[in-house]
Amino acid sequence: MQVSLNPEWLARNNDEHKIRRNDHRSPFQRDRARILHSAAFRRLQAKTQVHGTSLNDFHRTRLTHSLEAAQIGTGIVAQIKLKQPEFRELLPSDSLIDSLCLAHDIGHPPYGHGGEIALNYMMRDHGGFEGNAQTFRIVTSLEPYTEHHGMNLSRRTLLGLLKYPALLSATRAAIPPPAVAHQRQLKAKDWSPAKGIYDCDLASLDWVLEPLCESDRELLGQMRAEPSSPKEHRKTRFKSLDCSIMELADDIAYGVHDLEDAIVLGMVTRAQWQEAAAAQLAECGDPWFEEHIAELSEMLFSGKHYVCKDAIGGIVNALLTSISVKPVEAPFHNELLAFNAYIEPHMGNALEVLKHFVSQYVIQIPQVQRFEYKGQQLIMDLFEALSADPERLLPQATGEKWRKAQEQDEGMRVICDYIAAMTDAYAQRLHQQLFSAQSHY
């Protein structure tokens, strides 16, 4: 397959002239370096992947999850190149897929989903909050690599980070839930955010999509079927090839590696696994799982780390090698949109079983949900205090940004950006400084 991609996909919003002696790196190698060396990426080491597991230092953080997703992402690309060499020129380089997987979580706030719910509620009248939208905002404007364009990444890299290529105003439910009388009464399920890009970042989104023809742009922003209720959010249908690979890598890292955490930390039992996962995997329709599930179950719960790790590696490999590139069922003209990576249906069923098991027996258990609830309350307390008297309580540099943003009535977004960037520990420390009588500065 002959591919001639528009050189505009290598462009940067700010045509920078860096002083770099003998720099022979590709644009995507430079992108990877910028992400890896960013403060936003470093902070992921102090944002826990699954809350309530941190009594043991074995647990994964957002940073280790991102590293694992990157390793899986490059593995997906390598095996597609072997299996479908005709797509070799179209597929992302290792540096590009690495960049996407390393950056995909940097917009996540402290305290995971609890923090996301809290910020979305507090920003309900100011454009909302969502982790993927925040990731896009960090790389395009907030991270101080350039004055106005964030990390100033290549256009194709930014396209690959657009999991939901539409504005939040287009995806948000037509009828929002009513505000609560007191934040302690806030139900998480009512304030789960819509997925998309902040309306205030429209200029950055427009720049990324500039090389696309009008029909491709229109199609890319298309929604899935209308929701059954005006209280439900709408969802976008399409994403780029690079993004589809990153998303599969993320799903596999979540479904399989978080399962490993849960087993080693004793959060799930053999009986729970047998009933809620092994039985379904044996019937998922894939011959590999049907043949090996009994042996895999033995290995996972053997009590020996190296045996469990071997089983985890086998599952990752089985999922990874069942992914291939196929045409998207839509008339896109641009090759980056006309093809996506898909997992074989039976293996897709198996991945859904694993993700559901992790959600049901790890994420949704009271031990984890109490941590998320606590974080949710803590973040809302911080937002309430900082927004009540920002000139008094914000750090000097953030206060300056707030004053400038207030001229366009965007001050709340600056406060939101400040809190979203915090690590779990920093948010907790600031909360103690503001609200605890025992706090010592």
From Swiss-Prot:
Q: Does the keyword Hydrolase apply?
A: yes
The species this protein belongs to is Vibrio cholerae serotype O1 (strain ATCC 39541 / Classical Ogawa 395 / O395)
Gene designation: dgt
Which InterPro entries does this one have? Answer: dGTPase (IPR006261), dGTPase-like (IPR050135), dNTPase_2 (IPR023023), HD/PDEase_dom (IPR003607), HD_domain (IPR006674), PHydrolase_assoc_dom (IPR026875)
* Family of this protein: Belongs to the dGTPase family. Type 2 subfamily.
One Pfam family this chain carries? HD_assoc
Highest taxon in the source lineage = Bacteria
Q: This chain belongs to which protein, by name?
A: Deoxyguanosinetriphosphate triphosphohydrolase-like protein
- Which SMART domains does the record cross-reference, listed alphabetically? HDc
Q: Which UniProt keywords apply?
A: Hydrolase
GO MF terms here are: dGTPase activity
Enumerate the spans annotated as HD domain.
Answer: 62-255
| Any one GO BP annotation for this protein | dGTP catabolic process
NCBIfam families, per the entry: antiphage_dGTPase, dGTP_triPase, PRK05318.1
